[in-house]
Amino acid sequence: NKRFDNIKIEKKVVNEDPPLPFNLVKLQSYCSSHFGYNPADVMDITQSLRETHKAITYNRSDCQYLSEEHFKEAPKTLAQVVQNIKFKPSELDPTIHSKCFNDKNITAHFAIIPTNNKVDLNKLTEREKNVYLAVCKYYMAQFLPKAVKEKTKMTIELGGEYTLVAYSTVVLKKG
């Protein structure tokens, strides 16, 4: 018959940045968990998207950042992506300067993003389409407002012997 000695609840509202655009490893991981593709398949798919369809930038990048020059080109790139995928989030704003735009974090290459080229989704295989849309989604996320979340931590002490901790996150505004 233990009783709760102390219950402490901490709440805070946080703004959350969008995920950075993909590098090859992150894209392979995403495609594995979302579509069941193995890393070699993702490499082949991205190679086709890059060379055959001219749909994405250099696909073997180890970097998740973009240059300030990419930020300047964003209105044109976003307009083409929206036309290609026939979807535009209502809050898409090319003036939002995400933390991914940072010349200091660029390595030999930059993040994998869509190109300014016209892409006909009907000419892509299902796998190519899935990967292309994932790349587009992560790129477009850079131009959406930050997500707003309420994070709660509840700590319960039980009879001086045990401490239980529970966490909760509630999305107040999607980013």
Where on the chain are the PLM-derived regions?
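Core catalytic DNA strand-manipulation module of type IA topoisomerases
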Residues: 1-175
